[in-house]
Regions:
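C-terminal low-complexity, acidic/polar tails when present
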Residues: 42-50, 111-114, 122-123
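Short amphipathic alpha helix immediately N-terminal
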Residues: 82-100
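Helix-turn-helix DNA-binding module
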Residues: 98-115
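N-terminal interaction/assembly modules
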Residues: 1-80, 133-160
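Short, locally clustered residues in the helix-turn-helix/winged-helix DNA-binding domain
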Residues: 77, 93-97, 128
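Short acidic, glycine/proline-enriched loop segments that cap or flank alpha-helices
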Residues: 79-83, 111
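Amphipathic alpha-helical interface surfaces
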Residues: 68-72, 87-88, 119
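DNA major-groove recognition helices of helix-turn-helix
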Residues: 116-134
Length: 160
């Protein structure tokens, strides 16, 4: 008997939410960046200041944090935003970067609260999927996998 797994949207959304609210904020601080710095896709992730022997560990930590920030920004920039049915990039930017409240984003993109909650969850799931690729590109594979899996509801159909 085989078990088919699929992403659990609720738990994945919660994992992405925790990561982008807490870990992302910490990496921004460690890299010397601010949310206002990441509106430009040309961000290079390099820490500011001059390196010194006494501060080598801090420089390395800041450089790594910059790479994590770049991976997060690239992931958000790569999320779907090509039509009104998938405004995922806009939702992620407005909520996690600009700090807008859910109801304001819902009004901005023309969705009811219920529709918005679903779209936000789908945006979080897309972020979790795409983050796996961008972690490799930016050499931060030790960052957590945000995809939380569950047994597929209809897996009996596919069992051996």
């Amino acid at each position: 008997m085989s078990f088919m797994l699929e992403v659990d949207p609720q738990k994945t959304g919660e994992a992405v939410d925790r990561y982008l609210k807490h870990d992302f904020e910490r990496y921004l601080r460690l890299s010397g960046k601010h949310r206002t710095d990441i509106s430009s896709p040309s961000m290079n992730g390099m820490p500011s200041g001059s390196p010194g022997n006494a501060q080598e560990a801090k420089i390395i930590e800041g450089t790594y944090a910059g790479q994590v920030v770049n991976a997060i920004v690239a992931t958000i920039q790569n999320c779907s935003d090509f039509d009104y049915r998938k405004p995922y990039k806009q939702i992620l930017v407005d909520y996690y970067i600009r700090g807008l409240q859910n109801f304001k984003i819902a009004q901005k993109i023309g969705y009811s609260d219920r529709q918005f909650d679903f779209k936000k969850r789908m945006a979080q799931c897309e972020f979790a999927d795409r983050f796996e690729y961008w972690k490799i590109v930016y050499h931060v594979q030790d960052q957590p996998c945000l995809q939380i899996m569950q047994r597929a509801k209809n897996c009996a159909k596919f069992a051996d």
